[in-house]
């Protein structure tokens, strides 16, 4: 029996080898078999020692016929492999030893898998050969012989088999239930399914599981090794896990060709002609099933029209009330415009849209609740059902429009936007602008600090008439005295117009001008006025010399500019040039004091922040020197005279050597007619800085930057004040110094030498009560008793009597030095003449002095 079976097996082996292409395992190394296997080989080394009697059972020929259908072939091939377990062992002698896994099982597995070689194998089976069971294995010797013979064929066929196997394995993993897969896919799926206990039982069945392992037993049979090798591949498609599963469970069979085939053949799937199914992330296109796709379309659509073509039959997800609607609106008398709203919007929401539409005209002034929407019915409609009215904010706009305008609203039927009639914010901004324009400008900042603030408007009236301009300049700076003069000047004008002059003896023609200034005891201010008529006759040439001035009102004053900034210094110099005014510059306070000591300055523009010595210190030093040298209104000596004016030049110098140091002495007092006017210039506008500057001795406080119009007015104002003080210098400048003086003094009156004019003949004689009063007052002081008492009570009237004889000719009048509480006119001293002289000589002497 065993011999017969061995011969049949050998014959079938030889027939199979001749009819089919031998496929061998890619493994080159195989562990040596045990001694039982070598003994079982016996004399015939070509016989497979692992074959058993139960494995050599003949299979019915109809199982391997080529005319079977493909489905039957697959099922029967699967049944062949699944029925491989050893069910019919004939005798113990026929089992030489436990079956060991080899490449035969894997080879037969690939034989069923290989579609290209399926026909050749089926032909071999039809010729009467018995197909070898997958559980047969080869010995190491037989394997080496086969590898030596078929080495060339192995290399060519090995790649094809691996590629096809890898492709089938990948497709099998991607979809296990696909009926299109081949028989080998089913073979790999069934035994390796981990969910069914049958798969596990097949692995451990008596037929598939080897006998108890011994050191000589290398591993399980071919079928079980195949299942054990491919099961981890199905469960985990990672190569390291395949090796870790094979190594501990199979021992020596860990290098079995089945496991290695799975390891090598999964890789080259990229070059497979079979397309790989896309992953799950790419196949999933929606979160909802196909039956709910209409929801996605409804959400993404803008209207119900887009959902009509889907054919799903589901209603649209967009409500008809959400459709936008446009309404015609307009302002009274304006053009209509469209405003977007919703179908279910209220009138209040329409007002919000109107504010956004009229962002400039309405949005800047009104809020949406402030406006009202008025609707007018359509022409020809029932006025009772649809009257013209103001829409309420809570009314639905769509319903109202459909009620008033069935069929749609036209442009002519636009809603009217009504706004409140009176808005207080509108006029309020205009008033500040109006008042701002009416402000006098920079003059308002400085004149309020002066007591003569009411006289500030008089400077603009200067250009009106030359005589009044000088008078106005007189009144502006003269503060207390000139304020009364100006008030009295306006009152006496009507009496002056009346020719009641015959009573006074010979009033000079100055009296008409004194009519404008008729101070009873202060006729000094009227005296300059008589010179104005001559200025009208001869003053054209001096005015031509100062072409840029306003009728020559700015006198030839000398200005000292104290500024450390070269740019500001040049600007002020340019202003002085335009005004035709002489000037000098100083870069610091010390230099300013040094130049002031030279004399001849009428105005000082003093910057506060200066190097070496600041402006306030320089101002204090100038005021100190003026006080020590008796310039201006200062304390009197024991005799009641001014410290500066009561002494002759010789006596003055002698006393200065005793009381004053050389540094504090001013050598030529004739150049200092009055205290110089100091104007503080600073970039600070703080009130504290203003007070500090005024306390230091400044006459005015001005803020930078300085404009030319302001500077021109200021120079005119302060220059005219100095012209009144230095009347002699101003008179020379006006051309009166060379006039012939014809005086015919009589007891009854005086003929003014200034009235002679250019012809040298008195043009007119006029008398005024003011001049008569002045003369009477002078005579009363001259001849009346109590001359000593007069000196004590009215000390200011006695000083000019002593000064006039001592004043050197041509040095200018020192009248400004005799004022006690205000800069009095230099002519005040004229009326208090020498009592020994006749009145005519006194008047003439006064005129000569001026």
Curated annotation (Swiss-Prot):
Sequence ranges of Low complexity compositional bias: 7-25, 762-782
Modified residues (4-aspartylphosphate): 607
Homology family: Belongs to the SSK1 family.
Region (Disordered): 1-225, 419-542, 736-850
Phenotype seen when the gene is deleted: Leads to increased germination that induces more inflammation in host lungs. Decreased ability to induce the sakA-dependent stress pathway. Leads to sensitivity to oxidative stress and heat stress.
Ranges annotated as biased composition (Polar residues): 117-138, 177-196, 477-490, 819-828
Organism field: Aspergillus fumigatus (strain ATCC MYA-4609 / CBS 101355 / FGSC A1100 / Af293) (Neosartorya fumigata)
Purpose of the protein: Final receptor of the osmolarity two-component system regulatory system, which controls activity of the sakA mitogen-activated protein kinase (MAPK) pathway in response to changes in the osmolarity of the extracellular environment. Regulates the germination in the airways that drives enhanced disease initiation and inflammation in the lungs.
Domain Response regulatory: residue ranges: 558-719
Keyword Cytoplasm in annotation: yes
Keywords: Cytoplasm, Phosphoprotein, Stress response, Two-component regulatory system, Virulence
Predominant subcellular localization, coarse grouping: cytoplasm
GO CC annotations on file: cytoplasm
Comp. bias intervals (Pro residues): 492-511
Subcellular localization, as worded in the UniProt entry: Cytoplasm
Annotated protein name in UniProt: Response regulator sskA
């Amino acid at each position: 029996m065993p011999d017969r079976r061995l011969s049949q097996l050998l014959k079938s082996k030889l027939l199979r080898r001749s009819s089919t292409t031998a496929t061998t395992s890619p493994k080159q190394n195989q562990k040596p078999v045990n001694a039982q296997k070598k003994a079982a080989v016996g004399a015939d080394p070509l016989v497979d020692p692992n074959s058993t009697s139960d494995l050599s059972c003949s299979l019915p020929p109809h199982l391997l016929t080529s005319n079977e259908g493909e489905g039957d072939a697959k099922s029967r091939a699967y049944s062949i492999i699944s029925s491989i377990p050893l069910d019919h062992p004939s005798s113990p002698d026929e089992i030489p030893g436990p079956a060991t896994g080899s490449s035969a099982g894997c080879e037969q597995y690939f034989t069923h898998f290989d579609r290209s070689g399926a026909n050749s194998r089926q032909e071999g089976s039809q010729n009467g050969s018995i197909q070898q069971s997958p559980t047969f294995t080869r010995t190491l010797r037989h394997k080496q012989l086969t590898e030596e013979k078929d080495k060339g064929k192995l290399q060519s066929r090995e790649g094809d088999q691996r590629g096809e196997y890898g492709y089938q394995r990948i497709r099998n993993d991607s979809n296990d239930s696909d009926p299109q897969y081949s028989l080998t896919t089913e073979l790999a799926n069934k035994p390796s399914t981990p969910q069914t206990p049958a798969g596990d039982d097949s692995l451990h069945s008596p037929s598939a599981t080897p006998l108890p392992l011994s050191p000589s037993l290398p591993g399980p049979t071919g079928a079980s090794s195949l299942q054990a090798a491919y099961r981890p591949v199905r469960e985990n498609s990672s190569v390291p896990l395949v090796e870790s599963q094979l190594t501990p469970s199979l021992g020596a069979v860990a290098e079995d060709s089945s496991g290695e085939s799975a390891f090598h053949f999964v890789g080259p799937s990229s070059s497979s002609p079979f397309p790989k199914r896309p992953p799950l992330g790419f196949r999933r296109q929606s979160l909802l099933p196909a039956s709910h796709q209409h929801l996605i379309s409804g959400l993404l659509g803008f209207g119900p029209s887009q959902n009509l073509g889907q054919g799903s039959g589901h209603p649209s997800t967009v409500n008809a009330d959400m459709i936008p609607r446009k309404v015609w609106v307009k302002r009274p008398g304006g053009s209509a415009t469209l405003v977007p709203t919703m179908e279910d919007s209220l009138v209040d929401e329409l007002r919000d849209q109107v504010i956004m539409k009229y962002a400039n005209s309405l949005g800047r002034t009104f809020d949406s609740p402030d406006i009202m929407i008025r609707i007018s019915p359509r022409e020809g409609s029932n006025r009772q059902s649809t009257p013209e009215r103001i829409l309420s904010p809570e009314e639905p706009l769509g319903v109202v429009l459909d009620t008033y305008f069935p069929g749609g609203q036209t442009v002519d039927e636009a809603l009217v936007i009504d706004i409140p009639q009176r808005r207080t914010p509108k006029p309020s901004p205009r008033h500040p602008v109006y008042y701002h324009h009416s402000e006098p400008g920079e003059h308002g900042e400085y004149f309020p600090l002066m007591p003569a603030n009411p006289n500030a408007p008089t400077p603009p009236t200067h250009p009106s008439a030359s005589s009044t301009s000088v008078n106005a300049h007189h009144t502006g700076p003269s503060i207390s005295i000139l304020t009364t003069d100006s008030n009295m000047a306006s009152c006496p004008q009507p009496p002056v117009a009346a020719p009641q002059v015959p009573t006074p003896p010979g009033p000079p023609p100055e009296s008409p001008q004194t009519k404008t200034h008729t101070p009873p005891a202060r006729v000094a201010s009227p005296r300059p006025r008589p010179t104005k008529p001559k200025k009208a006759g001869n003053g054209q040439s001096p005015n031509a010399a100062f072409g840029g001035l306003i009728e020559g009102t700015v006198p030839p004053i000398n200005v000292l500019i104290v500024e450390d900034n070269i740019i500001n210094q040049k600007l002020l110099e340019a202003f002085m040039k335009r005004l035709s005014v002489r000037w000098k510059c100083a870069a610091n306070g010390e230099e300013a004091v040094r130049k002031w000591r030279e004399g001849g300055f009428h105005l000082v523009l003093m910057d506060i922040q200066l190097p070496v010595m600041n402006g306030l210190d320089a101002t204090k030093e100038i005021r100190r020197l003026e006080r020590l040298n008796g310039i201006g209104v200062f304390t009197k000596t024991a005799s009641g005279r001014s410290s500066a004016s009561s002494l002759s030049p010789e006596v003055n110098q002698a006393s200065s050597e005793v009381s004053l140091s050389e540094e504090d002495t001013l050598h030529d007092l004739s150049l200092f007619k009055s205290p110089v006017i100091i104007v503080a210039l600073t970039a600070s506008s703080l009130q504290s800085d203003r007070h500090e500057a005024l306390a230091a001795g400044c006459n005015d406080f001005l803020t930078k930057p300085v404009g030319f119009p302001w500077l021109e007015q200021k120079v005119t104002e302060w220059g005219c004040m100095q012209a009144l003080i230095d009347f002699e210098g101003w008179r020379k400048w006006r051309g009166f110094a060379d006039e012939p003086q014809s005086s015919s003094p009589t007891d009854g009156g005086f003929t003014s030498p200034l009235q002679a004019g250019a012809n040298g003949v008195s043009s007119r004689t006029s008398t005024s009560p003011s001049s008569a009063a002045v003369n009477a007052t002078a005579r009363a002081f001259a001849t009346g008793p109590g001359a000593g008492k007069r000196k004590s009570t009215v000390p200011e009237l006695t000083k000019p009597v002593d000064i006039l004889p001592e004043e050197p000719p041509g040095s200018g009048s020192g009248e400004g030095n005799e004022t006690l509480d205000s800069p009095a006119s230099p002519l005040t001293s004229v009326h208090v003449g020498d009592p020994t002289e006749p009145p005519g000589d006194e008047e003439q002497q006064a005129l000569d002095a001026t």
